[in-house]
Amino acid sequence: MQTPKLAILLALAMAAAMVNLSQAQNSPQDYVSPHNAARSAVGVGAVSWSTKLQAFAQNYANQRINDCKLQHSGGPYGENIFWGSAGADWKAADAVNSWVNEKKDYNYGSNTCAAGKVCGHYTQVVWRASTSIGCARVVCNNNRGVFITCNYEPRGNIVGQKPY
C-alpha cells in the first residue's frame, strides 16, 4: 500500500519541479534584468517590477491564448508584444532580446528607425520616463506558439520625443 503512495508523491514532486523550472526562466527578474541592461547601456535608470502591470499583462495574454495573435491590447500602458512559433520553449529573455536587437535600426540623432525597419520596441525598452514594467507569457492553445507581453508605465514612444 505504501508503494503507490510513494510513487504518487514522487510524481507530484517531479511535476512541481518541472513547473518551477519553467517559471524560473520567466520570473519577474528574467524580464527586468535584460531591460535594465539595455537601459544601462544608454545611461537610463532601472525599471522595477509592477504587480499591477503584471496583472494587466497576464489578463491580456490570457485573451490571446486561443489565437496567439500579435495584436496590441489598446490599454493605457506602453506595450511590447512577442510571438514565438510552436515547437520552441520561448522565454522572457527571448522576447526582451528580440526587442533590444532593434537598437541597430534606431538612429538617435534623427530619432527614427532605418528605412523599412521597426525599432519602437527597443525605444520603449529604453524610454527614460518608463520606470515600471509588468510582463506575462502564455503557451497558446492548438500548437499556435508562445505569446509574451510587457507593459510599461508611464508609457513611452511619445511622438516627437527621444527615448533618452
From Swiss-Prot:
Record protein name field: Pathogenesis-related protein PRB1-2
InterPro entries for this protein: Allrgn_V5/Tpx1_CS, CAP_dom, CAP_sf, CRISP-related, V5_allergen-like
Gene3D superfamilies recorded: CAP
Pfam families, A to Z: CAP
Single GO cellular component term: extracellular region
Keyword Disulfide bond belongs to the record: yes
N-terminal signal peptide: 1-24
Gene Ontology biological process: defense response
Residues passing through the membrane, by range: none
Recorded family membership: Belongs to the CRISP family.
Sorted UniProt keywords: Disulfide bond, Pathogenesis-related protein, Plant defense, Pyrrolidone carboxylic acid, Signal
Pyrrolidone carboxylic acid found at: 25
Domain SCP intervals: 34-152
